[in-house]
Amino acid sequence: MQLYNTLTRKKEHFEPAVPGKVNMYVCGITAYDLCHIGHARSAVVFDVLVRYLRHTGLDVTFARNFTDVDDKIITRANQEGLTSQEVAEKYIATFYEDMDRLNVLRADLEPRATTHIEEMISLCVRLIEQDKAYATPSGDVYFRVRAFPGYGKLSGRDVDDLRSGARVAPGEEKEDPLDFALWKAAKPGEPFWESPWGNGRPGWHIECSAMSEKHLPLPLDIHGGGQDLVFPHHENEIAQTEAALGKDFVRYWVHNGFVQVNAEKMSKSLGNFRTIRDILENYLPETLRYFLLTKHYRSPIDFTFESMDEAEKNLKRIYEALGLLHAELEREKWTSGPLPKDVTEEFEGLRQAFADAMEDDMNTAAALGHVFTMVRLANRILDNKGQRKTEGARAFFRAVLDEAATWFAVLGVFGREPAGFLAELRACRVARKGIDPAKVEELLQARINARADKDFARADAIRDEIAALGIEVRDTPSGAVWDVL
């Protein structure tokens, strides 16, 4: 598999340090608020990476942390009249609920910052002993950025350029404006722990270094997160970890791109902030997951309701095709004969193309394109009355459904029972568009009655009235069926 390594700025052949085993760490949430679609994208991207690596036979140990002590958590605790621990527990619980709905697998290890204070203090002590960090009279501990010659290698930033814009805030006791906090002295009303420098709490960056060292062998095979974490968080992780250990921290750095909303940066000030729960009030979770896979993970993705509607339509088309294949396989009598050779060759080519897309830096957008081509191929056989009843077609239909199981295993979509999913999808669309199903059924019955009375003008008028509601009616051998346009 080829993976783009942020550190080297190129795609590289992925090969774990220990053959057959992968250790992977991804930065999790700071638990102070509901998760937004940026969190959803990062979670889905790395969920697919874990799924795919396991699909190829690799034994993956996946760790994703929770930051449960932080300035933002303390601020939220004061706003809500809760303790910091209560705030963290509240939003970790909502995180799990959101991820379960998006079919994101639980990580194997989910360390929390507050249960690793001892490890963080130990890392600070090692850095101070090596003169890579220093404690201030006030009880803060800072990392000496200039003591680490490789600072900036991940983000491509130059230390001297950073220095020109850096300032020391009033009250700080930094030796250099570039230095960053490893440990923060306690302030009134904030949670704290005892340390060699007095009561205090960890800085943000030290948390991931300490937790990854505690739970996984270093160097990590993969360390991931959103593009926004490249600097300063991941740059600082590298500096403090490699300075303390004297060896490489991570072999492959993987970062997902930003989520924009209507081509603008998502922010509360712009009024375009979208939580996962906001979106799932109007769309099924699988629609959001599917949408997040329609762009390459390193590219920005633009969230719009139009793009969600398009994702919904495409998801519907695939499930409809899978449903038809399941129904066709209920046939009891099949005629002998294979399918044309070009059909089987095209199918095998598409299977390989799907795998090749995933091997090429996890290109889910291209992989989904091959899924659609395979669905069109299946529909072509279903539409051919001569071919669809053959033994060759039966084997082909089964092979497509087997391949759909692979899509689900790797992408985490297309795994529902088609009829159930389509019914839930219709109910979701009906609710979103404010359609009254009882009214539709009433009109359909009136249309049936008009046709029975041979009042075809009335029947056509009712059909137009139904269409004006945003409803499509299809007449089938078993009766009229309707769906949302």
From Swiss-Prot:
Keyword match ATP-binding: yes
UniProt catalytic activity: tRNA(Cys) + L-cysteine + ATP = L-cysteinyl-tRNA(Cys) + AMP + diphosphate
Entry superkingdom: Bacteria
Record's cofactor remark: Binds 1 zinc ion per subunit.
EC nos: 6.1.1.16
Gene3D superfamilies linked: Cysteine-tRNA ligase, C-terminal anti-codon recognition domain, HUPs
Cofactor dependency: Zn(2+)
UniProt keyword annotations, A-Z: Aminoacyl-tRNA synthetase, ATP-binding, Cytoplasm, Ligase, Metal-binding, Nucleotide-binding, Protein biosynthesis, Zinc
NCBIfam families assigned to the protein according to its UniProt record, in alphabetical order: cysS
Subunit relationships: Monomer.
Protein name: Cysteine--tRNA ligase
Species the sequence originates in: Nitratidesulfovibrio vulgaris (strain DSM 19637 / Miyazaki F) (Desulfovibrio vulgaris)
